[in-house]
């Protein structure tokens, strides 16, 4: 796996996303006026992200957590640089993001150690995420699904999350059926 990541990375930092668990549940809510209850399916992806510049794996729970932590990691690397400043409805949103970045910084200060990647494959799926640019308040780049050896380009964080979800949607093939 290390050779595949090095070969793919070139000069751009590549982050490996290992998905170790996918859990599904339903969130129920009642519509106004005591009417019918709606059930909305919710899917939670859990795993770790690793970057070749740092020693520790960073755990995440949910795609939102993955995106926020990866964004903080890209800010720390200062590559690729964002082309717009963060905006918020209030200072609390920016402060929360800055606190999350500060919590991650001690983990990001340690240099790369090859032992980190010895158990690098995720139990559900493993992706190599290559963010080339951060323009228009989003990311552009490519993602490679390592188990399937497939690569796709993405034009936004939303499109990246669709690609990750679509790989996790695939049912495992039943080897016993004819």
Q: Where does each model-flagged region fall?
A:
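Mixed-charge, glycine-accented linear interaction segment located at domain edges/termini
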Residues: 53-75, 140-178
